[in-house]
Amino acid sequence: MRSRPTHSMEATTVAVAVALALAAALAPTPARAQAPAPAHQIAEAVQAAPAPQRADATVLGFRADGSVVTLREGANELVCLADNPTQEGWSVACYHESLEPFMARGRELREQGVTDSGELAQRRWDEADAGTLAMPEKPAMLYVMTGDRFDAASGTVANGFLRWVIYSPWATPEDTGLPTAPTGPGAPWLMFPGTAGAHIMITPPPPGGPGN
């Protein structure tokens, strides 16, 4: 079992809220809207992935009842998740397959009624520390794209904005040389240092404003 540094409740709550906002597509909730056709979901989901990796990525989408379903089995290392039609806004994500146990556990906990963002993170961190939840053994990538909507006809995202997250479980500033807060637009920094959920955030400057 790994030891984990303690964090103030306020700092943990704020940090968890930011992380979950970036990965909103990763946590399905009970359906309130009709799910788009599978072809539409596949086309939108892969928008978060680098272009050379889109065609062979595994794609997860949503059934009419809001549950997650595999829409396409892939042939490379990426898993992409379509926009959740039950949530406001538009967001898709792609991540390395080694992150699937962590992501799937988050979806499972939400289906079990865990809705608090802090508890959702802490439960998974505790399980990872105990060795019951597999985490990546090497740095693993998560791509998160947000936007206004996906236009299937043109295959483009209106006002698309892509963020990069590199999961590096239990990484610390001492291990990486990274700061634990943003230092400027687009500058990398380490979020949740020392925890199973430690990851490097890279947020480019959005059009018309600074990033972090």
Predicted regions located by residue number:
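Bacterial N-terminal signal peptides
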Residues: 13-27
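Sec/Tat signal peptide C-region and signal peptidase I cleavage site
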Residues: 29-33
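N-terminal secretory signal peptides that target proteins for export/translocation
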Residues: 1-11
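Primary mode marks residue(s) on the alpha4-beta5-alpha5 output face of response regulator receiver
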Residues: 34-212
